[in-house]
Amino acid sequence: MSTHAETRAITAADIRAAKNTRRLAMLTAYDYPTASIADEGGMDMLLVGDSLAMVVLGHEDTLSVTLDEMIHHCRAVTRGASRALVVGDLPFMTYEQGPDQAMHSAARLFREGGVRAVKLEGGKEVAPQVEALVKAGIPVMGHIGLTPQRVAALGGFKVQGRSAAAARSLAEDARILEDAGCFALVLEAIPAPVAAHITRTSGIPTIGIGAGAQCDGQVLVVHDMLGLFDRFTPKFVKRYAELRGHAVKAVQQYGDEVRQGEFPAAQHSFGMPEDEQRRWEENVSGADD
């Protein structure tokens, strides 16, 4: 059970200031009830990730989700989170063309979605976008390593940075993104020693997902850690509950009780005052005659 008692809304500046002071906990959220649960559970940050394409909308990858869909879900999450910092993903092809496109997309996530930070994928190639957004007052979280929006170019969902050259490239990307103004950096599916090095040498918090225990914080997809998504489970996921199985059993029990006439019972139904019911029955009886 979380003992985190802070009630003030967390800001991107708070997250950056947490470097070397405390570990950060982050989960994805895509709707009001999940956001409310995660917020009450003491999460520092909630990510409205483009992973909603897979775990909520049923797509095979994250590439299909649109900016309008992201805004729709961001609205729901921001209504459910009173304390945690809500970060919205910029989806595929809404920022890659340059700073102007990134500014337009991020502004919509802020104004229409209500988020207080955005996340974008990529290394040195997106530094100009990061710089422009930060200059405009929009906090940016970076994301390197396995970047799902580039899964086609990466040849699938594979661990990144396993060669010395690739590891050096990741470390360089981390430095460039920090210099561009990112307040935090997601490290996804990279070797633990590489993530540890980036964490030690970076002045901003690193948030790991499949990047070992030495990161400044961790993030998981909420459907994975609660056992709600059964299509596949990444190696780096720990399941803290198996809610899908419980939910299926509950639905089956409901169906059985409906078909057997056991639901609704008297306590689930509404009655009438006795005198009004008597008048009603007399009226019905008279109409039948």
From Swiss-Prot:
Supply the InterPro entries for this chain.
Answer: Pantoate_hydroxy_MeTrfase (IPR003700), Pyrv/PenolPyrv_kinase-like_dom (IPR015813), Pyrv_kinase-like_dom_sf (IPR040442)
Region of interest: Disordered: 266-289
Q: What positions constitute the catalytic site? A: E188 (proton acceptor)
- Which residues are involved in binding Mg(2+)? D50, D89, E121
Where does this protein act, in terms of pathway? Cofactor biosynthesis; (R)-pantothenate biosynthesis; (R)-pantoate from 3-methyl-2-oxobutanoate: step 1/2
Question: Which EC class does it fall in?
Answer: transferase
Binding residues annotated for 3-methyl-2-oxobutanoate, in chain numbering: D50, S51, D89, K119
Please name the GO terms of the biological process aspect recorded for this protein, alphabetically: pantothenate biosynthetic process
Its UniProt entry gives the catalysed reaction(s) as: 3-methyl-2-oxobutanoate + (6R)-5,10-methylene-5,6,7,8-tetrahydrofolate + H2O = 2-dehydropantoate + (6S)-5,6,7,8-tetrahydrofolate
Q: Which cofactor does it need?
A: Mg(2+)
Q: Cofactor note from UniProt? A: Binds 1 Mg(2+) ion per subunit.
Extract one GO cellular component term from the record. Answer: cytoplasm
Task: State the compartments where it is located.
Answer: Cytoplasm
Q: Please verify whether the record's keywords include Acyltransferase.
A: no
Keywords in alphabetical order, please.
Cytoplasm, Magnesium, Metal-binding, Pantothenate biosynthesis, Transferase
What are the GO MF terms of this UniProt record?
3-methyl-2-oxobutanoate hydroxymethyltransferase activity; magnesium ion binding
Q: State the protein's purpose.
A: Catalyzes the reversible reaction in which hydroxymethyl group from 5,10-methylenetetrahydrofolate is transferred onto alpha-ketoisovalerate to form ketopantoate.
Recorded family membership:
Belongs to the PanB family.
Quaternary state and partners of this protein? Homodecamer; pentamer of dimers.
Protein name, UniProt field = 3-methyl-2-oxobutanoate hydroxymethyltransferase
Q: Which organism is it from?
A: Oleidesulfovibrio alaskensis (strain ATCC BAA-1058 / DSM 17464 / G20) (Desulfovibrio alaskensis)
